[in-house]
Each structure stands twice: as structure tokens, then as C-alpha cells.
Design a protein with these regions (language model features):
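C-terminal beta-strand-rich structural cap/linker in extracellular carbohydrate-active enzymes
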Residues: 322-349
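Active-site-proximal helices and loops of the catalytic beta/alpha 8
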Residues: 3, 58, 68-168, 220, ...
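Aromatic-lined glycan-binding groove of carbohydrate-active enzymes
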Residues: 150-192
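Carbohydrate-binding surface patches
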Residues: 258, 284-317
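Amphipathic alpha-helical
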Residues: 263-273, 277
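Short acidic/histidine-rich active-site segments
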Residues: 230-236
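Substrate-binding/active-site clefts of carbohydrate-active enzymes
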Residues: 1-65, 86, 92, 109
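The substrate-binding groove and active-site-proximal loops of carbohydrate-active enzymes
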Residues: 35-50, 67-77, 136-144, 198-209, ...
Length: 349
């Protein structure tokens, strides 16, 4: 099956100690969740650690060839000391190289291997995928009270060290979760099978309302602390439940283009406004269907108002001026710190 050489067939292979061979396992070796194509390795085996983290090893080679960093898939299943050795290898090439981890919960309170994980204590990950923000934002645009959603957001902001918070990966859809529009506008799968999932497609009024809610969600994701990430296809409102429906090919002929200019402007604003990179988050109002917060930087201040209600609201800005925000819309106001110029407005109906 695997030829004459290799750790599977040759007990004297130098790679034999990397794996756990035993007849009790499917296929005769320990694999991830029983998938034979994903054999698990013993991360504490010195020769394996050296192969990955040593000079001239996997990490060293690819970073020196131009990679900017690594994302550790399922970081929960890697021992802390192995993650720390990976970090050492990454930073040995350059302090600017980045180590991101897939962690689904609050990374500062996560338990695994019967102990509290040390992801963000300065010796492990630089930052993590921000699933708590994703959940809070999607829940808010679906109807959760603003005060509850903002409490969840502030909890992460207070728990994470500033460098980790500023570089956290913020998103609404991933290859491991239902697409954002499906979460917002369709009903939960609740364990129903692939045949049911494959036939689902939101249309009509539910689709139009879902699009407005998705737009609000991305306005929040792009303006909160962290680095926004757009999962391919969200810009054309692709739908889909879990794998493989959330990983469908990109629809190059899609007629839905209304989100593109909004996302492009949010990305440009995030790039040009200093407050969105490292600015402090200040909440001015979080009540029912209204979120109103600031990002306060050294040079600029940005003020974000999201109106999930079905009526126009008049909101008082921090400057004392008032502004209208349309139903299912948002407004972003940017001004220089210490000055009183004309405000730069970004309004979305």
C-alpha cells in the first residue's frame, strides 16, 4: 500500500517514532478523528520538532522564501511547548513574521490538555482567529440586544493583550462554519443532512433583508479592533451551510454586486484611518438595536453608529452634533483629534 520504505512498512525508519502504530487504530496507526489520510504525529519527538522548527527546517525554509507567517490549524490540539518552539523558529527569522492560531473560544481562558492554555502570554501565538467577535456580531444583526453583544465584544478586548487584540483575525464566514448570509437569513440546520442543506437557498424578501443585515455586520467587523478578513464569496452574498456547501466554487457570473462597493469603501477607510488600526474602543451607546461606539486614535477619531431598528434614529455624536441613521443602516464619522473640521461622513441607507 505504501511501498517498501517509510515509517509504516519499515520498523527501522528514522520517521517511525513520529507516529503511533498500534493495531487498535483504524489502519494500524493513530490518525486525526480516525481519518486515515491524516496520521497524527508525536509533537514531542525530538527529530520531528527539529524537522519543523530547526534551522533549515519547515518553518525556517518557507519564511526565508517569503512567507509572512503561519496559521496553526486546530491549535487546541498542539501542546503549548510545541507552539512555543514554533514561535521561536518564526521570530528567529524576523520579529515581524506572524504566528496565528485557530482558537474558537476566548484564547485567554481556554483549557486543554487538562490545563489552562498559554496562547497569549508572550511565548506562544501572536494572535488568534476571533470567533467570539464573529458570534457576537452575527447574533446582534439577527436580533440579540446590543448591550449583550457589546458585552461579549468588550470581554475579549479586556482579556486580550493589546498586540494580540490589534492583530486578531476578524471575520463572519469561514471554511469551517456556515456562510454569514445563511446564518443571518436562513434557518439553523439542526443536524439535518446534506440533502436538506444542498437544497436551501434564501430568496425574495428574506434575502433582501439578510443582505442589509450582512452589510451591517461587515460594517462592525471592519471597524472593531483587529484585522478584518473577507471570506471569498461573501462580497457576492454566497450562501451555504457546513462543508462542502460553504466551500463552493466562486460564482464569477453572479449578478449580486451590491455589497462590493460598500466593502471596498470599508476596506479603504480601514486602511487610511489611523484610528481603525490601534485606536481605543469606546462604547457610547449599546441599547436594543443600536450600537454607537468610537475608535480613538492619536491622530483621528472614528465614530460608528449601527441602526438595526426599522425606523430612522437621530443620534448625538461625541462632538455634540446630531446625525440621522437610516433603518438597517450605519454611519461612520471621521475627524482629526484636537480639531473641529467638517466631519467626513459615510452613510449607508
Amino acid at each position: 500500500r505504501y511501498g517498501d520504505g517509510g515509517a509504516y512498512r519499515d520498523p527501522n525508519s528514522p520517521y517511525r517514532s513520529w507516529y503511533d502504530f498500534d493495531s487498535k487504530y483504524k489502519g494500524g496507526y493513530r490518525s486525526w478523528w480516525g481519518f486515515e489520510t491524516l496520521p497524527e504525529v508525536n509533537e514531542e519527538t525530538p527529530s520531528f520538532v527539529e524537522f519543523i522548527t530547526g534551522e533549515g527546517g519547515v518553518i525556517d525554509t518557507w519564511l526565508r522564501r517569503g512567507a509572512a507567517g503561519f496559521r496553526l490549524d486546530v491549535a487546541d490540539e498542539l501542546p503549548d511547548d510545541f507552539i512555543e518552539k514554533i514561535r521561536t523558529a518564526v521570530k528567529r527569522v524576523s520579529p515581524e513574521k506572524f504566528l496565528l492560531g485557530e482558537v474558537w473560544e476566548d484564547a485567554t481562558t481556554k483549557f486543554g490538555f487538562d490545563k489552562r492554555r498559554t496562547y497569549l502570554l508572550g511565548k506562544g501565538l501572536d494572535s488568534v482567529m476571533n470567533y467570539p467577535f464573529k458570534n457576537a456580531v452575527l447574533d446582534f444583526v439577527k436580533g440579540k440586544p446590543a448591550e449583550q453583544a457589546m458585552t461579549e465584544i468588550l470581554t475579549i478586548c479586556e482579556h486580550y493583550p493589546a498586540p494580540a487584540m490589534d492583530t486578531a483575525l476578524n471575520f463572519l464566514s469561514t471554511h469551517d462554519t456556515e456562510r454569514a448570509l445563511t446564518v443571518i437569513a436562513d434557518e439553523p440546520a439542526n443536524g439535518r443532512g446534506r440533502a436538506w442543506q444542498s437544497g436551501r437557498c434564501v430568496t425574495g424578501d428574506a434575502y433582501e433583508e439578510g443582505l442589509l443585515r450582512l452589510r451591517m455586520a461587515y460594517a462592525i467587523i471592519y471597524t472593531l479592533p483587529g484585522v478584518p478578513c473577507l471570506y471569498y464569496g461573501d462580497e457576492i452574498a454566497m450562501q451555504g451551510y457546513r462543508d462542502s456547501f460553504n466551500r463552493a466554487f466562486f460564482r464569477w457570473d453572479a449578478h449580486e454586486q451590491r455589497l462590493r462597493p460598500v466593502l471596498a469603501q470599508l476596506a479603504q477607510l480601514r486602511h487610511t484611518c489611523e484610528a481603525f488600526r490601534t485606536g481605543q474602543l469606546r462604547v457610547l451607546r449599546a441599547e436594543d438595536g443600536i450600537l454607537h461606539y468610537q475608535r480613538v486614535g492619536k491622530v483621528e477619531t472614528a465614530e460608528i453608529i449601527v441602526n438595526r431598528t426599522e425606523h430612522i434614529i437621530v443620534e448625538t455624536l461625541a462632538s455634540g452634533k446630531s446625525t440621522e441613521v437610516n433603518p438597517m443602516g450605519f454611519t461612520i464619522v471621521v475627524e482629526e483629534v484636537g480639531h473641529n473640521p467638517n466631519h467626513s461622513y459615510y452613510d449607508y441607507v
